[in-house]
Amino acid sequence: MDESSSTTGGTDTESGADDTTTTRPDPTWTELPGIEDLPQEVQDELLALVRITEELRGLVFIEAPIISIVTDAELEARVRALIEEESADFPADDALYKLLGLLDEEVVLETLLTDLYGEQVAGFYDGETGELVVPMRSGGFSVVEKSTMIHELTHSLTDQQFDFDSVMESMFDEERLDQASAYQGLVEGDATFTELLYLQGLSQRELGEFFAEASDVDSTTLNSSPQFIRDSLIFPYDAGLEFAQSLYRAGDWKAVNDAYSIMPGLPGSTEQVITPSDYQRDLPIEVLAETITLSGYDLERQSVWGEFGFRVMLDQVLGEATGLVAADGWGGDTYFQWFDGDNAAFLLLYEGDTERDLEEMKDALVDYARTAVADEDFVWVEVFDNQLAFIAADEVPVGETIRSAMQG
């Protein structure tokens, strides 16, 4: 990925951006902080990648990005540390996924995700510090490492311009999880699209080097992970890329830029990322329900499962053909997740776009319950008042309590 190929497949720096994003606030900075100890040719290469990112993305950095160059081992250690910061949520999610038959009993979710991200993350952007953390082997950046740098620089650039990190952090803090997943699809899709534009400008030799290097990446943990874990990891990059490209085709970079402020207020949903034509058109139904108190259990979470949530659970257990048909009619939902330190309980209330959609989801969840939920656990699927209720619990009396509360 050399500088000479940077403009191929890119856009004019005025494209889709207003005056505040195309005029550099400080046009004089020519050095990047934190890389003074690197060889001069590497410093020059990093600065060139910054300028390439600006040109491809049609935006400019408000201030110089902070770049930390680490070894592969240091990168993995930092990724593992980030995963461990979220460790408080893992036991409850581990129990829920096992109750739903998505995770084998011998698998420890925290260990799986720590190993998976340690294996798969090639670099990351830390929104709290504004820092890019990327690896470099001796002798400079490889083709894949340059591509990764473009991706992470795009995150830094768009966060400076649109403050996406604080928006997404608020969504997670407020348990707006499907909305956060959709917004993450925009963020990762944007960066992946910019990275793709960069790759399109490479020579055949450089592309050969890229694919050869990419094929050597160890994916042992990814390949052995449950399908719903793999799909969840890939979603913001894969579906997000299609979403970002759809926005770009409709309105150039301006449409992508505008989505950063539009999606939080819609609200956005994974349905809109999966089907970009639904963006700003098919808004989620707000499904309301009274909170149920379960003796000995804490309410771990109330949120929205979302179309993507239904897709990954149904795809793994019943196959993608069933998952696609059943989840495509998603109108809205709400779910409650309880945990007592060992056992999980789950209530999911779903509304379809049409009565037929509701029946299709009911049929799918009945099959799912028979196939995935253990015989000794409680599971119940029923439609009432145009809502579909799916209840599962490790302890049968707890499941009965939830059902009784739903039946009034």
Summary of predicted features, one role per range:
Residues T53, S147-F164, A191-T192, A244, ...:
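Active-site recognition of the HExxH zinc-binding catalytic motif
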Residues I62-I83, M171-E175, E209-T220, M263-P264:
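Acidic helix-start/capping segments at beta-turn-to-alpha-helix junctions
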Residues L132-I150, Q179-A182:
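Short pre-active-site segment immediately N-terminal to the catalytic Zn-binding motif
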Residues T220-N343, L349:
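Pan-zinc metallopeptidase signature
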Residues G331, F339-G408:
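C-terminal soluble interaction/assembly domains
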